[in-house]
Amino acid sequence: MNAKIKLENHDAQEIKYTTCYMCACRCGIKVTLEDNKVRFIQGNRNHPTNQGVLCAKGSAGIMKQYSTAKLTQPLMRKPGTERGEGIYEPISWEQALDVLTERLEEIRATDPSKLGFFTGRDQMQALTGLWAQQFGTPNWSAHGGFCSVNMAAAGLYSIGFSFWEFGAPDWDYAKYFLMWGVAEDHSSNPIKIGLEKLKRRGGKFVTVNPVRTGYSAIADEWLPIKPGMDGLLAMSMVHVLLKHEKFDYEFLVRYTNASWLVVQAPGQKGDGLFLRDENDHPLIWDIEKEAFRNGIDGDIAPALFGEYVAPDGRRVKTVMSMMVERYLDERYAPENVALECGLPAEAIERIALEMAHVAFKETVELPIEWTDVWGRKHDKVVGRPVAMYAMRGIAAHSNGFHSCRAIHMIQMLLGALDAPGNFRARAPYPKPIPPHQLPENNIDIINAPNTPLSRPPLGFPTRPEDLVIDEFGNPLRIDKAYSWEVPIASHGLMHMVITNATNHDPYALDTLILFMANMAWNSSMNTANIQDMLRAKDMENFGEYKIPFLVVIDAFHSEMTNFADLILPDTTYLERHDSISLLDRPISEPDAAADAIRYPLVKPDRNVRPWQEVMVELAGRLKFPAFTKPDGTPKFSGYQDFIVNYERSPGIGFLAGWRGKDGTKSLKGEPNPNQWEKYIENQSFFAHHWPDNQKYMRFANKDYLDVASDAGFVGKVEPIIMQFYSEPLQKFRLAGQGLYDGPQPNNQVDRERLVKYFDPLPMWYEPLEQQRVDKDEYPFFALTQRPMFMYHSWDSQNVWLRQIMAQNYMYMNARKAVEMGIKDFDWIWVESHNGKIRCQVKTMEGTQEDTIWTWNAIGKQKGAWGLKEDASEATKGFLLNHLISELLPEKAGERRVTNSDPVTGQAAWFDLRVKIWKAAPGETGSWPQFDALKKLPGDEYERPNVLRYDARSHEKN
C-alpha cells in the first residue's frame, strides 16, 4: 500500500502531430513521446477530419508500434525450400535491391507486362500508380476492386463525385439522413461527429442494413433489408416520388440530363444514344423556341417530358420520359417489392414521402451570393436538407453499381446534391462525368521495352474503343480489367490476379509484387485454394512456380509473407514520411480542400525501410524518365525530395499547401524546398477553406470552377451535368447487340452480359451468384462486417484491441435460431456451393432473419501476426472467405467468369448464400485449420500472457 504513483514528467516529454493510419479515415493525431517511445496518442482538435475525436483504433496505435508481429529485416526464401514453408535467410538491403533490380531490369527490357504490382490499403496510389506507369506495365491497381469501386464508379458516372472520399453529408444543415449499408468502421470519427450534430438538432436518422450494430443501433428507424435488394428498394422509392410528382423541376432541367433527347431506334445503330448537333452537343426540345437546342446552353427552356421527331426523321424522347415509363411500372410499387426486400410496403412509401417533405417543405436557404457557370447571378443558395451515405453493403454485390446509381437517382430527383443539408462534394471533386482519364490501351506502348505508358494504368472508359484489349478482343491486363468481361473496372480486379496468373489466363507473369495486401488470407476469396495457387508449379516448365517470383512488402508478419520469395520489411506509420495527397485519396471536407503528411516520430529499432523510399530508389536504378536526369542519374535524393519537387503538371505536385518558392501559394505553385517543414509547423495538415461563394453547387459554380480549373481539379470551366442516363453504358450495350461502329465482342457470354447489364438507366437484377445456386438448398444470406474497433487484419494483432475481441462468432437472428434448435455458443457448420466452415454461433435480435454474419478478419492462421499458436483468433476465430469463390459457379457451355459486378469488376463478397446446421457432439474449434506459420529470422519478440506497457520506464512485459 506504500507504492508511489509515478506522475508524468512533462519536461521529459515531447508532443508531435501526424496523421493516423489505423484505418482509412486519416484522422489527425497528437502523439506524446518520451525517450523515443510513444507515451500516448490523442486526437488533434485542430484537424479538419476528426476535430480531436479519436476512436479505439487510433488510441491503440501505440500497440501497433510495439507489435510483436513487426518484420525486422529483408529475407530471401532459402534455396531448396518450398514456397510457403516459411524458411528464410536474412540478406542485406543492398542484396535485396540488387536481386529485385536485376529481375525488374530484365522484365522491363523484354516484356513489361510480365510484372504485376498490386497494393492494398496503402493510401499512396498516386505514387504507386506513377511507378507502374513509368515501369511500363498495365498490371497495377490498389484494392478498390475488392473494396468499393461500385460506389466510386456509380458516383463518377452519375453525379461527378461519390460516397467515401469524394463526398460527405452536410451534417451542419441536414434534417434527414438515410444511410445505406455502412459498417461502423467506415469514416468512423466523421460519421460519429455528424450523427451527434444531427441528433442534437432533432434530425431523423434512417438506416438500411440487414444488421443493426454500430451506427445503425442509434438510428431512429431501421430497415432490415435482405442483402442485395437495396437497388430494388431505391427504385421503389423513385416510383413513389414520381407517382406523387415529388421532384425538383428546376434542378432537373438545369443541372441534370433529364431533358436530353434519346434516340428511339430499336435494332438500329445509334439506338439509345443522345441526339446531338454537328458539334456533338446533346440536344433538348426548347418549349419556348419550339426548336431543338444545345442542352448545355444556359438560356434554354427544356421540355422535361415529351417525344419528338428529329430533323433526320428519327424518333426521340426525353430521359425523364424514359424514367417515368420504367419506374412508374407497377413492378416497382412498394407493395410489389416489399416481399423481395423483406420490408413493409408502408415503410417504403412513407420514408420516400418523408424525404420529399423535408426536401421541399423544410428547405434551407443561405443568403450567399454566387455566380453560375452560365454567368447568372444568384442571391442565395437553396438546399434540400436530405443527406445520404452508402458504402460496402451496397458495393459488395454484383448488382451494386446499378444499386448505387439508383440511390444517386433519388438524390438528383430531390435536388439534394452539393447544397446545404445534403450530400456535398469534397475536393478535388466534382469532376466531369466520367473523369477525363482513360486507361492505357495502346498495345504497341504496352509491349514496348523500357518505355513508360503514355497514360495511367487505370481510368474511366466511355466507349468500347477505350478497352484494354488486343485486336482479337483478348485482355491486356492480368486481372482482365477493361476487357469485355468487366469493361468499366475503374479500380482493377486485385482479387483475380493470383487466380489468373496461376492459370496463365490471359498470360503468365514473371514477377508479382504485393504491397500491404494479405492476399493469402482475408483479402482473397477462396482462401485455401489461393494458398494452393501460390504454391502451384508448372510441371511443363521444369517444375517452375506458376507465379515464378513473388515479392511481399509489409511491416508485419501476415499470412501472406510466408509465401514470398523476397520479403522487404516496411516501417510503421510513426516511422516514415507519407503524403496524403489531393492527387490521390485526400482528407478534404466539403468546406475545405485538404491534404496531410506523416513524418517520423520515432526511430525504427529494426533494419527496415519505408516502401516509398524504396520505390524512389528503384525508380532511379531502373532509370524511369520521371525519376532520372538526362544523364541517367537519379533526379531525387529520396522520397521527401520527390514529394517536394515532382510536378504532375507545372505547379501541381503531391502536396497543395505552402507552394511557391516562398511558400505563400496554395493548391498550385512552384516547388517549395521548405514544404515539409511548413506542414510539420501546421500539425501535419493543410486546409484551403472555400469562401462562401465557392462552397455549394460546385458542379455549376463558376467561382469554384475557376479555382478548380487552375488547381488542376478539372480541365475547362464548364458545367458538370449530372447523368440519370449513362450514354457510355449504352455504347457498350450496342456493342453487345452488334450495332456499334467500333469494337464488338466475339464471345457470346460477353455479348449477353453487355446487353443484359449495361442498361443506361439504373436497373435491378438478382445478384449473379444467387442466380446460379439453389435457394432452397442455401436459404441464408451470409455477410461480414468490419468492427468499429478493428480494421481488417491490421488490428486483430493489436494487444489492446484484442481485449475487446479475440474471437468472432457467427451471428444469427434469435427467432430463427430457436426454430432451428440453435442456441448461443453452439458450434455450427456453414456451407456454400464453394466450401464449408465450422464456427461458434451467437444470437441477436438486430439481424434480418434470413441473414447470418460475422466480423471480418478476426480469424488468423496459427503463427501469424505475432500471436501465440493457441491464440483464440487461430483456434476459435474463422474466416467467411473459405465459402466464397472468386469465380461464379460453373454454367454449361460458358467459360468461368469472375464473381464480380459485370460492369465494374467489384468483388461480390456479399452475394453469398449458405446453409447451416448444428455440429455433432465433440465437433468443436474452428475449421478449416492450417499448418502453423514458422517464426521468421529476427523474430525475437516475447509473447507474454499479461502485457504492461509504460513508456516512462520502458516496461513492456
Locate each region found by the language model.
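Long, well-ordered, tryptophan-enriched scaffold segments
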Residues: S216-A217, E221-G375, V381
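Long, contiguous, secondary-structure-rich segments that constitute the structural scaffold
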Residues: P600-L601, W611-E670, D795-Y811, R815-N957
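Glycine-rich phosphate/diphosphate-binding loops that line cofactor/substrate pockets in enzymes
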Residues: A96-L115, G167-K175, R326-D329, E349-A387, ...
